[in-house]
Amino acid sequence: MTEISEICETAFKLTYHPIYRGSLFIHLFVSISSIIPLIYFVIFKLPKTSFHGNLKFLFSAYFVSVFLFSVDFAIISTTEILIPLFSKHPCNLLIPDQYLKIGNTTVSIFMSLSTFFPISITIERFIAMKMARTYEKTRVRLGPILTGCNILLDLLIVFFIYRDEKFDDGSISFVFFPKTLAPKMFTFFWVMFFLNLINFTFNSYLLRQSIRLKVSTSSLATKYQREEVVHSTKFAVFVVFCHVILFGFYVIGIMILRYFGSIFIPDPADLMATRGAFTTMISLYNLVVGSVAVYLNHLIKTRKSEEITGTVRIQATGAVGAQNYENAIFNIWNSV
């Protein structure tokens, strides 16, 4: 009974701690705000891009996974805000085991799923660079296959991590990992972070190679195809970079607070509240990724339009303009 009372007392202190309580409202606001740019980009912007269907499919799946992550977090934060309003006893603040298992598992699935897609996008970009001359004519198969592999692999990993977990520690949040589960999940996140870091390096190499191949191409048709690969790869590189920075910040921050937090925050209650608040701030990643995608798409589209305008514009005045006019008339007569 003493242990149960201590758990309930700790739950009460953490639930009503101003740092943690305030973070839930911020978390809810950020989660809802992140949904808007994600929906806007996936529905209104991504379909209009000149990206190959495989890349569009992968980006759609990636941003949809981030969108589902935001929705899940919005539901979770709303629930955690409302629970104290209807709790009459400190122990009522603890989430029942069966609900905690479902909520915590979905958080892990959506959080980890988005970390697989940048690697798949790099695989698709590598194949696109190698097959630049014929890739535009290939059917949309690679994107769905890679997406299916991502989902299956993520589900299998989460299943093996969670299969022996009983969820009997008690928790006030769906986001907190149980003591026996936390080391496994953080190891998984570290592995994914380093894989994404390597992936970003390779993606940057692909971009440089694509630019080099475009410059060395003499054929106008081939140059245009290479240009499309360069633009889409640029977009992919910036999205992957954003993903690596934000995900890395989250993982490193969690580990610092977990193992060295007591050095900076000596009070146990304040440290626990700060760790809880930082854990919920992963929703900021969703907002930034969606907003950056919209901005980058607009920027690349604008620069591409300027490049095309500069390429096709011919001088229409003076001696050069007269020569251009004469050449145009000559070409028309030759085509008759």
Swiss-Prot record:
Record field: transmembrane: 24-44, 57-77, 109-129, 142-162, 186-206, 237-257, 276-296
Keywords carried by this UniProt record: Membrane, Transmembrane, Transmembrane helix
Record's subcellular location: Membrane
GO BP, sorted A to Z: sensory perception of chemical stimulus
Principal subcellular localisation of the protein: membrane
Keyword Transmembrane recorded: yes
Topology class, membrane: Multi-pass membrane protein
GO cellular component: membrane
UniProt keyword annotation of Transmembrane present: yes
GO MF annotation, one: transmembrane signaling receptor activity
Any matching Pfam family: 7TM_GPCR_Srb
Entry's family note: Belongs to the nematode receptor-like protein srb family.
The name this protein goes by in its record: Serpentine receptor class beta-15
Naturally occurring in which organism (per UniProt): Caenorhabditis elegans
